[in-house]
């Protein structure tokens, strides 16, 4: 693929120009039947294996689904190379050009006092909920009760934030975490 392009672009769904964009758009249209929004279909094809990948359609209102056409743009193939490298390593690896970052960042004690709140939909097909669980457990080995994990049933990846019911289902949870005091032992 990198012989013909350095990126993939969901915007091809609005009018592909060139042989590769047309071929990929036709392939995605033929294999993704979840909706009539070709940009939405391309996003699913680019970012994962789901139908759809980044959200559950029942959580999107028609206006948001239409708005998605303008929200996604070029994705460099270097992103996929980094993801493949990370999968092979079993943890996130530094991206090309930032080799000064430690290779074993996930295997050492965090160099921060930041509190992390992991939030994902159980139906997330972009980054599986299991990855959030593993990250939470890895950080919790160093500070029990400091970080939080929320796996939201029925949600996917971005519908946690874009979903029509997110203001009632998810945002109160985010506010509660933002307002949650730090444990006494960490101040």
Residue ranges and their predicted role:
Residues 112, 118-120, 124:
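Short beta-strand/loop motif that positions the catalytic acidic residue
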Residues 125-134:
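Conserved alpha/beta-hydrolase "acid-adjacent" motif
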Residues 2-3, 133-134, 166:
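Short secondary-structure boundary/capping segments
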Residues 1-98:
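Alpha/beta-hydrolase-fold enzymes
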Residues 87, 123-124, 156:
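Conserved beta-strand elements of beta-rich interaction domains across eukaryotes
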Residues 136-137, 142-187:
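Catalytic active-site module of serine/aspartate enzymes centered on a nucleophile-bearing elbow/loop
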Residues 100-113:
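The feature captures the conserved acid-bearing segment of alpha/beta-hydrolase catalytic domains
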Residues 75, 79, 131, 166-170:
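Soluble or luminal CAZymes and related metallo-dependent hydrolases
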